[in-house]
Amino acid sequence: MALTAALKAQIGAWYKALQQQIPDFIPRAPQRQMIADVAKTLAGDDGRHLAIEAPTGVGKTLSYLIPGIAIAREEDKTLVVSTANVALQDQIYSKDLPLLRKIIPDLRFTAAFGRGRYVCPRNLAALASTEPNQQDLLAFLDDDLTPNNQEEQKRCARLKGDLDSYKWDGLRDHTDIAIDDGLWQRLSTDKASCLNRNCHYYRECPFFVARREIQEAEVVVANHALVMAAMESEAVLPEPKNLLLVLDEGHHLPDVARDALEMSAEISAPWYRLQLDLFCKLVATCLEQFRPKTTPPLANAERLNGHCEELYELISSLNNILNLYMPATQEAEHRFAMGELPAEVMEICQRLAKLTEMLRGLAELFLNDLSEKTGTHDIVRLHRVILQMNRALGMFEAQSKLWRLASLAQSSGAPVSKWATREVRDGQIHIWFHCVGIRVSDQLERLLWRSVPHIIVTSATLRSLNSFSRLQEMSGLKEKAGDRFVALDSPFNHVEQGKIVIPQMRYEPLIDNEEQHIAEMAAYFREQLESKKHQGMLVLFASGRAMQRFLEHVTDLRLLLLVQGDQPRYRLVELHRKRVTNGERSVLVGLQSFAEGLDLKGDLLTQVHIHKIAFPPIDSPVVITEGEWLKSLNRYPFEVQSLPAASFNLIQQVGRLIRSHGCWGEVVIYDKRLLTKNYGKRLLNALPIFPIEQPAVPDVIVKPKEKAKPTRRRRR
């Protein structure tokens, strides 16, 4: 469809009307350029897909919503906006779209949050109830759904009252009633514990109400994981050809796609034996109490026992082989170089993939049959078996996926990283097997780039080292396929609004010097805090270990510090805002992930402290396998893998400071390698243009280094 004059006029009229709705609206050339580029791509006038980097301040959300809605209406398609985190998803759903509804008549929109963000009305009813009969019923259903105390029961009763009276939509983030993580875990549910259409609360369930609204909506706000799953299953969202898709925070997309090529599962022989025995008993119960019209051949007791026995023998053999590869210590790990399994192990994995897939199919068949029997059997007994079969299905789905991945030699032309771990919990030894694909371009091509006619990939940061090369390699987007790559200018004057400070550190932030380097960092930080020049500060670390060492040096300042992990992130940010607004000093402290999406303007944040250049962890099995593969292709892992990742992280961290025309301040980076190493200049050149200062560091009294207890990473 061409971008007609009428469509251009409609987009222009909405943009003009928007300016009347926003106080102190500042027209920006980059925003107008983005609206035009998005419109041309979605209308099919310019290329296949568009990757557009829109720095903070451009107003990217409204820049894709306005043309997206106009073209969706013209073509009778659904605009799907996908984000990577709940905060941005909720901002678009609760703030941006309601604003646009004021200027766009009858705009229909909804949000598709993950199941875990919604309350389960069945669980809420149980936790809000004071009736012993209700608790007895749930105990029979194997659910741990009793309030811990009377206060918790009253809180749940208030939540239930709000839900029943439509004051609350069931989303965790949309209630003012405090819900701690432990309580929410019992209030929400997952796929394995959901009764779906068999549930008494199905019609009013917030999760399923939201899913039904998708069919009527013009705009659906989703997340990347849901979009990928929907494209795979062809469910939830409209057909790909009837979509206009915007992937906001698009730099996360390769990592989300990688989740489809990532699996870790326990494979300990005793644990496996228990799961198989429980499943055999469950099948026997189904045949005895809820016999299907046609009994699946594999459900025959003798055949099923033989099938499970073969499965157990293979798992037992694999346990023995993996234990030989792993060191003799109780806790151990073995990674297979280049993801290449020995022939014997590969044969076992291929057979396990087939056997577990057959059990997955059997569990699914029984589950479908059980779901049709709700009108003819004791509902409580039936629901108990449905829940148990649901959990068995989830377990076999995970195992089937694990062994399918293990059986792959390559994915998207690159190895699949594979490793085994042994760990001790409660005195018991557990064996785990892990698989992660290191490239996902083929999956993205199949599910997205080839399926949806036109897609917008956007973020404040898409490039690293001033190049789209890393994004192209990881995502599979390419110019020769008709994809366009655009980097918009920032609307801010960074030279006037801020500066970069690189203190004159004696030590580089290497592991051997970590204690001395952090002591220097703490001394400079203390000096800055005591100067009282900055009310709102943020300190970011590359590792939890370094953060804890830093905190040991500033124990006397602990009341000023709001540290990641002390409380949920949103509560820390709320408290920080409150402190600074009241004229107090406040310091947020966390890992680099803590800062993503953090939007603190003006005096709320005027000084950002960055511990060091955040290179990828060198001990990650995935990073090591990728490095081996790159070397086998005569490519330099540091240039292809480590440096672009470090550049991206640094751009994200520095980007926390200047969020509006009224922002000011400085970014302190405690890493002299930016000035002494050849790559340092390249990292600095990829940042906004700030003046650079190099102040002296106060004298430090170094504490004696305590031997850290060895820690072992379970996952990448």
Q: What do these predicted regions represent?
A:
Residues 503-515, 566-675:
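Conserved RecA-like P-loop NTPase helicase motor core
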Residues 185-218, 228-237, 365-506, 517, ...:
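A contiguous, basic/glycine-rich beta-loop/short-helix subdomain that forms a polymer-engagement track
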Residues 2-20, 26, 75-78, 83-218, ...:
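A substrate-engagement module of RecA-like helicase motors
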Residues 542-566:
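Conserved helicase motor "Helicase C" RecA-like lobe of SF1/SF2 P-loop NTPases
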Residues 78-87, 456-460, 535-542, 669-670:
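Conserved RecA-like ASCE P-loop NTPase motor core of nucleic-acid helicases/translocases
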Residues 64, 70, 90, 94-98, ...:
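Signature of the SF2 helicase/ATPase Hel1-core->accessory helical subdomain module
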Residues 44-66:
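Walker A/P-loop
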Residues 446, 503-542:
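Conserved interdomain hinge at the start of the Helicase C-terminal
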